[in-house]
UniProtKB/Swiss-Prot annotation:
Interacts with CHUK/IKKA, inhibiting its kinase activity. Transmembrane segments: none annotated. GO terms for molecular function: ATP binding; molecular adaptor activity. Gene3D superfamilies: Death Domain, Fas (1.10.533.10), P-loop containing nucleotide triphosphate hydrolases (3.40.50.300), Ribonuclease Inhibitor (3.80.10.10). Residues 1-94 form the Pyrin domain. Belongs to the NLRP family. LRR repeats lie at residues 637-660, 698-721, 722-745, 750-777, 806-833, 863-886, 920-943, 949-972. GO terms for biological process: inflammatory response; negative regulation of innate immune response; regulation of inflammatory response. It holds the Pfam family NACHT. This is NACHT, LRR and PYD domains-containing protein 4. ATP binds at residues 155-162. The pyrin domain is sufficient for suppression of NF-kappaB activity, it adopts a typical death domain fold, but in contrast to several NLRP family pyrin domains it doesn't bind homotypically to the ASC adapter, which supports the observation that NLRP4 has no effect on IL1B activation. May be involved in inflammation and recognition of cytosolic pathogen-associated molecular patterns (PAMPs) not intercepted by membrane-bound receptors. Acts as a negative regulator of the type I interferon signaling pathway by serving as an adapter to promote DTX4-mediated ubiquitination of activated TBK1, and its subsequent degradation. Suppresses NF-kappaB induction by the cytokines TNFA and IL1B, suggesting that it operates at a point of convergence in these two cytokine signaling pathways. The gene is NLRP4.
Amino acid sequence: MAASFFSDFGLMWYLEELKKEEFRKFKEHLKQMTLQLELKQIPWTEVKKASREELANLLIKHYEEQQAWNITLRIFQKMDRKDLCMKVMRERTGYTKTYQAHAKQKFSRLWSSKSVTEIHLYFEEEVKQEECDHLDRLFAPKEAGKQPRTVIIQGPQGIGKTTLLMKLMMAWSDNKIFRDRFLYTFYFCCRELRELPPTSLADLISREWPDPAAPITEIVSQPERLLFVIDSFEELQGGLNEPDSDLCGDLMEKRPVQVLLSSLLRKKMLPEASLLIAIKPVCPKELRDQVTISEIYQPRGFNESDRLVYFCCFFKDPKRAMEAFNLVRESEQLFSICQIPLLCWILCTSLKQEMQKGKDLALTCQSTTSVYSSFVFNLFTPEGAEGPTPQTQHQLKALCSLAAEGMWTDTFEFCEDDLRRNGVVDADIPALLGTKILLKYGERESSYVFLHVCIQEFCAALFYLLKSHLDHPHPAVRCVQELLVANFEKARRAHWIFLGCFLTGLLNKKEQEKLDAFFGFQLSQEIKQQIHQCLKSLGERGNPQGQVDSLAIFYCLFEMQDPAFVKQAVNLLQEANFHIIDNVDLVVSAYCLKYCSSLRKLCFSVQNVFKKEDEHSSTSDYSLICWHHICSVLTTSGHLRELQVQDSTLSESTFVTWCNQLRHPSCRLQKLGINNVSFSGQSVLLFEVLFYQPDLKYLSFTLTKLSRDDIRSLCDALNYPAGNVKELALVNCHLSPIDCEVLAGLLTNNKKLTYLNVSCNQLDTGVPLLCEALCSPDTVLVYLMLAFCHLSEQCCEYISEMLLRNKSVRYLDLSANVLKDEGLKTLCEALKHPDCCLDSLCLVKCFITAAGCEDLASALISNQNLKILQIGCNEIGDVGVQLLCRALTHTDCRLEILGLEECGLTSTCCKDLASVLTCSKTLQQLNLTLNTLDHTGVVVLCEALRHPECALQVLGLRKTDFDEETQALLTAEEERNPNLTITDDCDTITRVEI
């Protein structure tokens, strides 16, 4: 950019463009802006009388040229003089054009440089138009005042994240994207940056600039028009863990790279700048917690046509290409793997190796393990030889040892000491690099990685077929059973993708033959026994918290392709819980479930698999067969008693298949839950299941839209004489007041229904109909849930009348309704009556105040049936609790459970609560979580807990809300009293039976 552009003459020229009134407003804005920016003030008297030329001189005199221009540009923006802003931009683009030319040259060179796989040679370096449009949309300002965007590109290794970023940089340098959005776009690779000594952001920018002296001041003058592209974020060790006090806001200050990038991401430095961050699938918790993420974009890799193009380019011979492609296309799993370009290269390389040896490709395509074993064993078999040499055998064994260590220590980059410890000598390294299975990594000469994490996983699995974990030089390497448990439990080792599958896949008969041929031995029988024992333990332990990922188990068993063992293994499981999100999941689940005969509980979801059917599309025959295998477990597993289907979309044909299995005489379900399920077809088919299922006792619909006709059909089915449903939940099902008429008929006519939950539906004016039905002496309902049903205080009159006349309802939940003190007063009139039989009342978040507690206190004394009272999330405060405590200490009060969470309580009320603890003979559970109690209040409560007459068994407090002294006090009290539990999760504690 020409130096004269920053002169006072250039500034004067722009000021001349302002009309008289605009020039006056410019001066007013100047006064305000310099105050906001805390800049040295130009005397207002001088500004006020200055001409355009004089004001330009004043600006240059009091502020440096660059700063003067930045202030002027900001004022132009405030005045909405976009034309002047654009003129400035055009004149400033000298630097931008210089940098764009450099970026284009740099990234074109990187694109053309030789890679291991050379995948890029088969595809154009230019970004497709649809990709350009999508990238532009990602960074389009969404709201005024919220310009900066932080976008995450998330995907597995090899999916093409770095490729996309390189294409983005080239497209930006050609003005194909972000043309009016970003003046400068800088690419930082964390893998390279982590090797740098402490540096500054200015230095990092200068590294990317074509000349030694980058115009930093100019570059950052409009930070809202800066984009920082950060690749391989997971390589940033210790990133985002720094306390706020360690962050840096100075562009010129030298700090460790992770601190600089953390300062950028957490908006301490250049908060107006936008960020594009590429990361592997497991998004670190600190990134989610510390960074405001605008959007997450997941690259799709190769689509089907890309895969076909790649096969044709790779094999050269069209006939061979189509032979390989068609075989892979027949396997959902292999075809899915080809979505990731690097894995597609591995698969094609493996097939090409087998072709050249005249092998049957169908055998190689039997499983993922077969592809990888062929790939790896061929790399370690010298060209023209029948088998490996002792040296290549040793090299592969050493590599397997290294891989196992890496998987257990979460290490994916290795130094030479790591290699030596596992038996890789220096002389082996060139040969291993020559196989391409091991690569040099980053800038350091002595740093190595496996070609892909899946190759590392395969080698780690292979280790267990060659040696015992006890023979490994690193103590972190554990036994097979621990590996399997870690693989099957959702919360552990989330980054293990294929490790368990490769381990079981290597037990396949054909794979054992390969192992015998290559190594002369293998340990398959011992491992099979360990897998059996592991699944037996999991089956006996159960899965109460949903910790075990049944799909992970299914994938491992599917990979074995051993029906006899699979049948034996799946029947060790009593529960299955899994999510089907693609066709591969569907195939794998179907394969295993068709052998199940011992399941007691099944919970699953199906998403993105079954599309809506019409004359143009239908569910494929193969998908329907797989779906039938999944549904058939309802009839083949004689012990299955509970089915939960959630977060699912079913097409008409799959819905019909499911309903047919549900109504089969061999289906003996007792509990059926349908949560957030949408289905095409006649819903009456589902309700008619009740005609055929006399064992069904519990039926639940949640977040599933039911029409008026649906409700009518459902209630007709529930009234079927042979039906035995006792519990019905229709939560958040879009019910309306009109539906209450049909439900009222159900309550009147059905003599088996004891539980009804219609929470989260807008029922309001329909509640009187329900209450009228419940006034009938013939109703048998015990539990009634009306939480968040948009009830008002007027509804309380009908509910009160019902409580007086009904002799069966024991549990009533009216939470999350605007009842207020007036509604509570009406309810309490009924509660005080001797004819009221209610045992449990939930009034959480009902907008009750301390004033309402007086009526509630009176009811507690009068009603000796009431055992449970939940009034959390109401601002009753210390005054309200004081009123309740007077009732709780009364000899006629029989309350056993009291919920006072988040009621605005302080330690002031602890003395009153303490008196309840020492006087009440019945109170067993008291929830005080989410209140602002301090140490003094807790001391008072603990003194009461030590009283010999105290009957409390559960005290609801979150220990971590208190200081160390108070936490120690609460822990000591728990240890002193073995019958006392102090927890912040009172819902998990067993309730008193009604």
